[in-house]
Swiss-Prot record:
Keywords assigned by UniProt, alphabetized: Carboxypeptidase, Glycoprotein, Hydrolase, Protease, Secreted, Signal
InterPro entries hit by this protein: AB_hydrolase_fold, Peptidase_S10, Ser_caboxypep_ser_AS
GO molecular function: serine-type carboxypeptidase activity
Organism field: Homo sapiens (Human)
Localisation per UniProt entry: Secreted
Glycosylation sites: N64, N126, N362
EC numbers on record: 3.4.16.-
UniProt protein name: Retinoid-inducible serine carboxypeptidase
Length: 452
């Protein structure tokens, strides 16, 4: 395990200049936070497996970072980069044009972005045998990173620590959260673990697939014939999962997506009110002339690595960080990450969420109204399957309306919460809730972390 702090006390007015000019400043610099405090490094989590993390200290004008929570953000895919997409496209201090983000979560929490699993973003492996193959391996790697992080950053050991996530990142967050709880109980990791937040998360893949047809039909994006076609392949996915044929289920999942694209004129799986690019539909028609896994990866990781973001990460950001190996590029191993998780992809983790709830860990589920790939109907379906004894009381509650702007009468979300389970329905948002509804996402984060 290797971890060394990378920081340099540079006057803030100088910090943005080299990056905006696309120049190499020479020394590692700490922009763009108000306090100008960032650290980043690699941790060797296994032989030939190196995980990259990037920490921003909170920049609240009224509170010290030690008075605010620490949020770790996990991206989806698997193979999507937290330090890239989550940081510059969703919740970090700057957007992908390097302009300040008004809704950055940094104003209410310190942010820890981790490129996970190994091979994602700036994380990398040396040798094909070092990729993670399943959730257990992903969680084990993260325990090595978190043990190292909290040992070296003792100032965060007592700060409330939350794991926020998106998409497949939610599945990883559940598994990581449970292993972290166990590690804390054993005394091998010292931190103040406060909860997990599962955003549009791949907790029960088959429940998502089964809900696609009814959801699209209710939104006038399928008619009777199309609904029948989608429902037929969804049943095939269910049968494969029930038989434990998870590789086959993953392939059938890809087939279901192709049928949906053909019947909806290329609906966008991440926001049904926006259109997929024409190349997306064209590529889907060619899917089974290539490896179905490679095609699925192109569809579900490509949007997290668009050209502009890739150029930013492999250009100015790489120069800023100064520790990326010369033979590694941001996102260069993403396809291999996705392919190596094939067997694990369609496995549900409802039982893990149950274990978290039974352990008293705060669990928040939040979902965008316009998401298709992990639609709200599917999320509600797996929540109803929880064996948590308090679920009936949770279900009987009436939800409460939320407003991102207290001066507005427009409803931004609904929430239902009982004991250590909460569910947020985020309106007018797709799969990437912070990107679509930044104000409401920030408000939700504050509510989850008990700041409102």
């Amino acid at each position: 395990m290797e971890l060394a702090l990378r920081r340099s006390p540079v006057p803030r007015w100088l910090l943005l200049l080299p990056l905006l000019l696309g120049l190499n400043a020479g020394a590692v610099i700490d922009w763009p936070t108000e306090e100008g405090k960032e650290v980043w490094d690699y941790v060797t989590v296994r032989k030939d497996a190196y995980m990259f993390w990037w920490l921003y200290y909170a920049t609240n004008s009224c509170k010290n970072f030690s008075e605010l929570p620490l949020v770790m953000w996990l991206q989806g895919g698997p193979g999507g980069s937290s330090t890239g997409f989550g940081n510059f496209e969703e919740i970090g201090p700057l957007d992908s044009d390097l302009k300040p983000r008004k809704t950055t979560w940094l104003q209410a929490a310190s942010l820890l972005f981790v490129d996970n699993p190994v091979g994602t973003g700036f994380s990398y492996v040396n040798g094909s045998g070092a990729y993670a193959k399943d959730l257990a391996m992903v969680a084990s790697d993260m325990m090595v990173l978190l043990k190292t992080f909290f040992s070296c950053h003792k100032e965060f050991q007592t700060v409330p620590f939350y794991i926020f996530s998106e998409s497949y990142g939610g599945k990883m967050a559940a598994g990581i959260g449970l292993e972290l709880y166990k590690a804390i109980q054993r005394g091998t990791i010292k931190c103040n673990f406060a909860g997990v937040a599962l955003g549009d998360s791949w907790i029960s893949p088959v429940d998502s697939v089964l809900s696609w047809g009814p959801y699209l039909y209710s939104m006038s994006l399928l008619e009777d014939k199309g609904l029948a076609e989608v429902s037929k392949v969804a049943e095939q996915v269910l049968n494969a999962v029930n038989k434990g044929l998870y590789r086959e289920a993953t392939e059938l999942w890809g087939k279901a997506e192709m049928i949906i694209e053909q019947n909806t004129d290329g609906v966008n799986f991440y926001n049904i009110l926006t259109k997929s690019t024409p190349t997306s539909t064209m590529e889907s028609s060619l899917e089974f002339t290539q490896s179905h896994l490679v095609c699925l990866c192109q569809r579900h990781v490509r949007h997290l690595q668009r050209d502009a973001l890739s150029q930013l990460m492999n250009g100015p950001i790489r120069k800023k960080l100064k520790i990326i190996p010369e033979d590694q590029s941001w996102g260069g191993q993403a396809t291999n990450v996705f392919v190596n998780m094939e067997e694990d992809f369609m496995k549900p983790v409802i039982s893990i969420v149950d274990e978290l709830l039974e352990a008293g860990i705060n669990v928040t589920v939040y979902n965008g109204q316009l998401d298709l790939i992990v639609d709200t109907m599917g999320q509600e379906a797996w929540v109803r399957k929880l064996k948590w004894p308090e679920l009936p009381k949770f279900s009987q509650l009436k939800w409460k309306a939320l407003y991102s702007d207290p001066k507005s009468l427009e409803t931004s979300a609904f929430v239902k919460s009982y004991k250590n389970l909460a569910f947020y329905w985020i309106l007018k948002a797709g799969h990437m809730v912070p990107s679509d509804q930044g104000d409401m996402a920030l408000k939700m984060m504050r509510l989850v972390t008990q700041q409102e």
